UniProtKB/Swiss-Prot annotation:
This is Ribosome rescue factor SmrB. Residues 98-173 form the Smr domain. The keyword RNA-binding applies. Belongs to the SmrB family. It comes from Pectobacterium atrosepticum (strain SCRI 1043 / ATCC BAA-672).
């Protein structure tokens, strides 16, 4: 491949005479750092506070009135029963999953609180909580805890593809966007 723009000797000499007396510039080696806020521990503290706030609603003594016949289900008073029907049919697919296998009741409450806080923060409407079968401790307690939380609109036993009777699909009330 040949050089398209080759210069003859006269043109090179003319160029060299035209640039005489100029100094070579040094490269500017200063790198500009972007102005950012330090993230620090604020998000970690906020996440911990959300988790504590969300688990505050879970009491072991309170026994809400849940239907004992048929699959595990609940709909908050004032919420649409049609939403519960859509949960049962599997019309909603969960975006977040929580597996409670192997956790103690205290750990399960904290993780459940963190899940509900994450759902509100990330604007997730449907989540799946897998409590498993085990000794039926978490299987019995999880619906009782969920029914106490004010952000839970409804829950229903999950369809087979999401865990069947070892899991619950949960609908979470999202914050209404402010018009300010």
């Amino acid at each position: 491949m040949s050089n398209k723009y080759s210069l003859n000797d006269d043109e090179l000499q003319l160029f060299r005479t035209s640039i005489t007396g100029t100094k070579k510039l040094r490269q500017d080696t200063y790198t500009h750092k972007p102005l950012r806020r330090k993230i620090g521990e604020l998000p970690a503290k906020r996440a911990l506070q959300e988790q504590v706030d969300a688990s505050f609603y879970f009491s072991d003594e309170f026994q809400p009135q849940l239907d004992t016949e048929g699959p595990t289900r609940y709909v908050r008073p004032g919420a649409s029963h049609y939403e519960l029907k859509k949960l049962r049919r599997g019309d909603y697919s969960p975006e977040l999953f929580l597996d409670l296998h192997g956790l103690t009741q205290l750990q399960a409450k904290q993780e459940l609180g963190a899940l509900l806080a994450a759902c509100r923060r990330e604007h997730v409407y449907c989540a799946c909580v897998m409590h498993g079968h085990g000794k039926h401790i978490l299987k019995q307690q999880t619906p009782l805890w969920l029914a106490q939380h004010p952000d839970v609109l409804a829950f229903h036993q999950a369809p087979k593809e999401f865990g069947g009777n070892a899991a619950l699909l949960v609908l979470v009330a999202l914050e209404a966007p402010s018009l300010e």
